[in-house]
Amino acid sequence: MSIDLNWDTVTGGPDGQELAQKIRDFIHEKFQAVPLPRFIKSVTVHDFEFGSIPPEIELKDITDPLPDFYEEQPGIDSSEESDSEEEVAYENEGEYLDDPVEQQYGRLRGASASESRRRLTVNSSTGSRNGSGPNSGRVAYLPPHLNPHYNGGSGNNSSPSLDRDGRYYRDPNTAGLGGPAHGTNHHHADLGSPFLGVSTPGIPGGTSNLNLHYFTSQFTAGLSGTQTPLAAVAGAAHQRGPSWIADQQQQQQQQNNMLPGGAGGGGAGGGGMGGPVAAAAAAAAATNQGLHSSSTPHLRLHFPGVGTGKPTPGPSPLTGTSTPLGTLGTAGGVGGIGRGMGMAGMGSMASMGYPPTAPVLAIPTGPRHKRNPSSQSLNSVGDYSPVAPAPAERQGLFSAAAATSPPSSTPSPAVGLGIGGRGIGAAGAGAGALATSGPRLQIPKQGLREKHSVSTLAPNSAGTSNNRAGSAILDDDDGFLDGMHDHRDHPAQQQLEPEEDEEEEEEGEEERQRFREPRVEDIQAVFRIKYAGDVKLLLTADILLDYPMPSFVGIPVRLSITGLTFDGVGVVANIRKRVHFCFLSPEDAVAAVGGEENKAAGSGNGSGIGGGSDGAKTKMGGLLQEIRVESEIGQRESGKQSLKNVGKVERFVLEQVRRIFEEEFVYPSFWTFLV
């Protein structure tokens, strides 16, 4: 279907002149960015004219728009094209945007600033907003714990512990920290049970929220020091007096006495109350029994996020020595997210707490093992720096001496295992098995292997160590330690995995947001455009002469493009309030329109006699097929020109015109117009 185009209306008048001026400026800017050959100093575009011959336009097809047309363009403001159905309604009529707090919560509920301003209503007579008195609207929407005028849920709120957004609040009338964690109707309050996760001795009000925020902050680093277990313990000790630590020591001693075979360090505290305070309790218990030894190597314990403990006596379990596990010196208390496992030794405790709060062994540096950490691994062998194990100890991470070691005359160590429901960490003494003879303790290698992580450690083909007869700790046939080190079962990992999934979803959402959603009304038209007109482009180029020296003088060359021949396929798409336009390459043009018409036209023109020579040269999709150019150098004197048709300059200019056209107007490049 042919389309008649009123060429004079499009190109004439002030609008046509402005459009021609913009095209001239555009071509001039492109020539300034082109690297010029040595013999041309500069190129300047002076004028552009559309001419009087219109192009021939034929509609070929109506299809769906190309996918690239739906891509968001940051340079174009899309706020003006937002439709009413895409705008999110504000939840509450009359909410205002003066208050920064209101702005924060308004955006969290999904309301845009412009929509909020449009729906802003103020009662000018009383000066109140959604309230019964002056500034009641401002005060009512503050967070409940910052609102001194909040009445505890009186009025329309059905639940006294919910604010207007359905969030729990702490009753402002509750004194101290001993009140319920989430309002007066919270029935868990302070029950003192280590399994409910709401209370810890010395921390009234519970530590369930404290643990969650603190241990997550080890990976996100978003909380201040006042929200750490150390600060909570200090605050509790300040409230209850200096006797609190003594009570903890007494409780620790009672737990130690529960272990068969003698004193054990036991797990210290519950629900994140580990760290230095528990370390002090364990150290005091061990000191009273005289178990410090200055002749043993030092074992340095470090509490991530809390501080570094002092070196305490005891051999390193990762060095080449074959020291019983039970004779580790005094160690710090177990941190941990809540309940878990504690290992008690002779008057001390070998902490096996779960990261990020369990003590991390800082072994003297030796040959290091480097590996790439995986996203599924929190506790990594690569996080430590152990020395190379002795050959006799390569069958397990914690290796033992031979079973024929001479019996020890000293009291045998006791190991307490306290198993909780939420991983490895703090939890008091448990039932322990007693090693009554001299053989050393050994933990099989597969019991401490790391799951769900990528490691370059070569697997040990020797299998499990045969020194099981002298070990009274555990047998890993049931995969007990495998469960200990299954990171996905740990609350911290369970919390991190959804965060990773959320990050992936956000990335996918951002990728989807780069493209708009197609609509039924989106349309695209495919045209075949033929043009053999008298479009004019005037430009000058300065030619440098190298005689008698390089770049001796520059001579201006005037170039005039007086017409061109064009045959191509154009695409115009209308998407919402934008119009996209481009030409297709010759290959895409043939695929979109078909080459049969082009073949028929070529054969028809070839059969003609003496006519249609221009038509025989045209090829559909060939775009710029011919450019007519005139050039002259110097000034006219007595009707003569000094020089015409400088070949090199003409070829360079025509080549650049073709390149600019193809780079700027041929798909995947396209032009967008706001309508």
UniProtKB/Swiss-Prot annotation:
Residues 66-186, 241-270, 307-327, 365-390, 444-517 are annotated as: Disordered. One of its GO terms (molecular function) is lipid binding. One of its GO terms (cellular component) is ERMES complex. One of its GO terms (biological process) is phospholipid transport. Residues 123-137, 317-327 have a biased composition (Low complexity). Coiled coil: none annotated. Residues 261-270 have a biased composition (Gly residues). Residues 78-101, 497-510 have a biased composition (Acidic residues). CDD domains: SMP_Mdm12 (cd21672). It is found in: Mitochondrion outer membrane; Endoplasmic reticulum membrane. It is a peripheral membrane protein. The keyword rRNA-binding does not apply. Residues 373-382, 454-469 have a biased composition (Polar residues). Keywords: Endoplasmic reticulum, Lipid transport, Lipid-binding, Membrane, Mitochondrion, Mitochondrion outer membrane, Transport. Residues 1-675 form the SMP-LTD domain. The keyword Endoplasmic reticulum applies. It comes from the Eukaryota. Belongs to the MDM12 family. Component of the ERMES/MDM complex, which serves as a molecular tether to connect the endoplasmic reticulum (ER) and mitochondria. Components of this complex are involved in the control of mitochondrial shape and protein biogenesis, and function in nonvesicular lipid trafficking between the ER and mitochondria. Mdm12 is required for the interaction of the ER-resident membrane protein MMM1 and the outer mitochondrial membrane-resident beta-barrel protein mdm10. The SMP-LTD domain is a barrel-like domain that can bind various types of glycerophospholipids in its interior and mediate their transfer between two adjacent bilayers. Component of the ER-mitochondria encounter structure (ERMES) or MDM complex, composed of mmm-1, mdm10, mdm12 and mdm34. A mmm-1 homodimer associates with one molecule of mdm12 on each side in a pairwise head-to-tail manner, and the SMP-LTD domains of mmm-1 and mdm12 generate a continuous hydrophobic tunnel for phospholipid trafficking. This is Mitochondrial distribution and morphology protein 12.
